[in-house]
Amino acid sequence: MLCLVCGVVVAGADNAATVATLGPFDARFVVRALGIGLLLLVVFLIGERLMKAPGKTRRVDTFPVLERYRSLPFAGRLLVPSAVMLACWTPVIVIMYPGTIWYDTGDQIAQWYGIEAYGQPAGSISSHHPLLDTIVFGSLARLGDALAGDYRSALAVYAVVQCVVMCVELTGVCLYVARVGREGAAHMAAVALFAFFTLFPALVIFMMSIVKDSLHLLFLVPWLVLFAETARTRLEALHSPRFAVGFVALSVLTALTTMTGLYVTILSLCCLPLTRAGRADRLRALAVASVTALITMMVFPAAVRSAFDVEYEDQNQLLVVPMQMTARYALDHPGDVTDTERAAIDRVNHVPFEDMAFRYHPYLADPVIQYSLRDPSGVGEYLRAWAVMGLRHPDSYANAFAALESGWFSLQRTPMNVTDRGIRLDELRGIAGQAAANRIRFQIADAISPAFARMTRYHANNANSASRSRAYALWGFWQSTPVLRVLTLTALWTFLLPAFLLFRLLRPPYGRMLARCALPAAYAAPLVWSLLSLLANAISVPLKPTASRYMLWALVVVPFMLALCASERSESTCQMKGNSR
């Protein structure tokens, strides 16, 4: 049944990502949904069989190199594979040096230099992006100016250091899998995980990017390991004060480096007290969540506000999806709106209702909703009008949401990459037969914002343009090579592999334990909340690399979850306490 549901979702998402409607639900749709569902069932069963295969336990003394490696202290066992991974990443690091500046990063740095961005007054810092990221990137630029007379120099060093640190962290993830899983299978899973992290170029390409999401990943990876250990030991890991303090520190840093990271981190921490454990242990977990929320939502904002001129934005980002639905309603039913509803919409949004149909872009909310609201006090009135209109024509809302978020579920997408205007539905239908595969798209060349271009010492980095073209060619090779290109599909990471994890959870022995366990797989909470957070984004189809940037955390989180699942001990997850070696 799960595979059939997945087939229906993918078929509907393919329609939404190519023609901006879920239907038509005709015979072709049924055949495609059944075909995808059957294929997924076969693949999932094969994957399950591979995961259940007993790993071979080899005697260490038969491999002298392995024996010497295992005799090393922990630091050696961590750094030696990290050096191997870094050596494999080095060619990409070289061709992408000095790192990619993203559009948003340029705005953040420009603000640190007192240049106006996002319509905010010059000299102020906008809260449109996480303040910690702005402080980090701006301080690095200032450091480069002070030490080398060029702000780009410190950012280039930062990009390389970011890659080095990530190699160490990913190696630590592999060592953790090898330590906590069943003997034999755990080592095989760890080796497979290490090979993926080492050879798949998406990770190193992204880590050579200077952007808030790559900084976030630096804290997310070790936080995931601590979260998994806390869940695996049924909260007993929190008995260690050093572990608990480190967990809180990483939770705070993970939460402060992306907007969605704040909610994902705190909501995940709130799941830990639900674990079947002692009352004292649950209180410790609740304390971790409470302290993290207090620091990230009250202490840090107050401290930054006292030190810098921060311009706090209204909550326009919370209305991205509702306003996109309103725009689709304006396109489908322009005459079926009351004067009161029209006034409520026009009061809140800069784009009036009468212009929404023309500006509507099925795969991008930016043309409809701006960086701010016209009158934030009218949000309540707007939401009431929005609800009434949705009850009147729910089909428009469903198609608007499906099109906007279809990129997380679809295998195909429209070949159009237009972002500076609205797109008519007849345009999409006219080129639906040229649909392209929905693949991860990277920002490799610099994306320079107008504010960043105004910096007096800014100069385009053309010296490395030839090398960066080789980075594009490398990713193009992976996108076009049979078998390898499957790994470049967005939906593989944001829907299909998570669906496989759910498939494993519902199958024996997990299925029999769901009634007895509060959280049979508590360590999956970050994955669940992260996936749900994707559904509030203003773009999912990669018309521009921003869409792919939102999901690149999945390239670490999903393989980590798969490795834990493949190497889990034979004891039930209800008895995982005490599994550590």
Task: Report each predicted region and the residues it spans.
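Start-transfer (signal-anchor) and selected internal transmembrane alpha helices
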Residues: 1-4, 25-91, 522, 568-574, ...
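Extracytoplasmic catalytic/substrate-binding loops of multi-pass membrane glycan-assembly enzymes
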Residues: 96-110, 120-140, 148-153, 553
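Specific aromatic-rich, kink-prone transmembrane helix
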Residues: 113, 215-235, 246-247, 251, ...
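Membrane-interface anchor segments at the N-terminal boundary of transmembrane helices
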Residues: 153-160, 404-527
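Membrane-interface alpha helices of multi-pass inner-membrane proteins
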Residues: 243-258, 290-296
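Membrane-proximal stem/loop segments at transmembrane-domain junctions that anchor or position
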Residues: 309-461
